[in-house]
Amino acid sequence: MDKRHDPSRRIIAPHGSQLSCKSWLTEAPMRMLMNNLHPDVAERPEDLVVYGGIGRAARDWDCYDKIIEVLKRLEDDETLLVQSGKPVGVFRTHADAPRVLIANSNLVPHWANWEHFNELDKQGLAMYGQMTAGSWIYIGTQGIVQGTYETFVSVAKQHFGGISKGKWILTGGLGGMGGAQTLAGTMAGFSVLACEVDETRIDFRLRTRYVDKKATSLDEALAMIEAANQAGKPVSVGLLANAADVFAELVKRGITPDVVTDQTSAHDPLNGYLPQGWTMAQAADMRKTDEAAVVKAAKASMAVQVQAMLDLQAAGAATLDYGNNIRQMAFETGVKNAFDFPGFVPAYIRPLFCEGIGPFRWVALSGDPEDIYKTDAKVKELIPDNPHLHNWLDMARERIAFQGLPARICWVGLKDRARLAQAFNEMVKNGELSAPIVIGRDHLDSGSVASPNRETESMLDGSDAVSDWPLLNALLNTASGATWVSLHHGGGVGMGFSQHSGVVIVCDGTETAAKRVGRVLWNDPATGVMRHADAGYEIAKNCAKEQGLDLPMLKD
């Protein structure tokens, strides 16, 4: 019997202002854990899988039940420790300490690979937490939409003079992360053709308005893209097909998209990527009987896809890796120039990271969408001179369907996070919001991750693989009084390729929350400015000086 599989489970987080726990500081992690497994949020909630291959919220259902039980009894001077999705201890701390500390998927470096992890996973000794799956702050696909939108806007600026009309993006994957590409692309003015092997994922994206149309053949999909481009109105198409097949076929036909990327779950060749010519049922059976054959076939298909991406780049397409480690997998399979196209962070996002700008997100614990709309208005009020941000908030309200508890994401930095959070806390205090707000972020942020093939690729000083920074980030957020803090390994790019930390804090309207929020949401993005200033980025150095950061080794 698989203790991780229970199709009878249907998890819905409580709404409203009535507590199930002893305070909002423990109610919040309980609701957010449950929200990660909401049927409209998680990819396979019956298996505790939230997104990203096998990214889980808890190790098994017994562990999930025990976490909920402990959170309901946890006092406001106690801290729950969670080890790879398993609640292992409750300790007396103090009121300003985190209520939950989480460590997921961490392995001693020599053993930090999928083979060793999968053995531990099969024995029930580990859990893959991805980034926000095991840290209980996943908000559905919206969580990556703005970052993807910002990337595509930057692509348009760098390659097409800021004009995306009549241009189209080829990509793969419509899972929890990849599903953002279609909506983000059309928001940025591009048409998007996204390949996906799982028809249920395409149908889900249609239902939640992330995809406009479904196609079952490449010719049909290309006709949809061509018609939309002729009409000057972007369209997103989910094509039921294997990305490796489609990418290679476009090369064969001499058809060159304007932009090429990919967000299949290539980081996990065993569980996340379907080999060419295989059915999903065949892959599921083979994973039980011959894991090595699955991995070998998946990586061979990735090599085909990456070679096609290189060929399309040579034909003129703006080609980028979107952080799923597909280049590494292809490189290991013989594509020696796999890294000839850049990752999206060094190519398009790093200047934002230098100012601590990243994926700031918040969730209405009330379950009331009006609480989010009121906070949207507050963001506009406090940041009046940023039309790009205002446009994002308007588009998000109009086009993004909430999944589970209502949430919002917007990319803001060191200058704004703490003051926005304190304003939200004041709104809770004054009764403008019907219940507290939780504020968190993706682990993909400026100071919270070491990932040489993604966030820290091609650092100015060569410090791509130095992982002291996310450890310091987690320690500082703990010391600053965050409500829960997490430290993970392998998110986004797979085992052995990343370490990263997460933070969540509750705005419950109290004065103590205002103080904690001020510390945490200043210090957290400040570590990103610190990390990039230390690496020699002038934008970060200037930001540090302007904001008065005390960085002892920063020269005037």
From Swiss-Prot:
GO BP terms: namely: L-histidine catabolic process; L-histidine catabolic process to glutamate and formamide; L-histidine catabolic process to glutamate and formate
Q: Which Pfam families match?
A: Urocanase (PF01175), Urocanase_C (PF17392), Urocanase_N (PF17391)
Which co-factor is required?
NAD(+)
Q: Which NCBIfam families match?
A: hutU (TIGR01228), PRK05414.1 (NF003820)
What is the protein name for this chain?
Answer: Urocanate hydratase
Give the principal location in a single coarse category: cytoplasm
Q: What does this protein do?
A: Catalyzes the conversion of urocanate to 4-imidazolone-5-propionate.
The similarity annotation says: Belongs to the urocanase family.
Give the subcellular location. Answer: Cytoplasm
Gene Ontology, cellular component aspect: cytoplasm
Q: Which positions are annotated as binding NAD(+)?
A: 52-53, 130, 176-178, 196, 201, 242-243, 263-267, 273-274, 322, 492
Please share the entry's free-text remark on the cofactor: Binds 1 NAD(+) per subunit.
Q: Which InterPro entries does the record associate with it?
A: Urocanase (IPR055351), Urocanase-like (IPR023637), Urocanase_C (IPR035401), Urocanase_central_sf (IPR038364), Urocanase_CS (IPR023636), Urocanase_N (IPR035400), Urocanase_Rossmann-like (IPR035085), Urocanase_sf (IPR036190)
- Which UniProt keywords are present, listed alphabetically? Cytoplasm, Histidine metabolism, Lyase, NAD
Catalytic residues (positions): C410
Reactions catalysed: 4-imidazolone-5-propanoate = trans-urocanate + H2O
Q: In which pathway does it act?
A: Amino-acid degradation; L-histidine degradation into L-glutamate; N-formimidoyl-L-glutamate from L-histidine: step 2/3
| GO-annotated molecular function | urocanate hydratase activity
Uppermost EC category:
lyase
Which EC number applies?
4.2.1.49
The keyword Cytoplasm is assigned to this record: yes
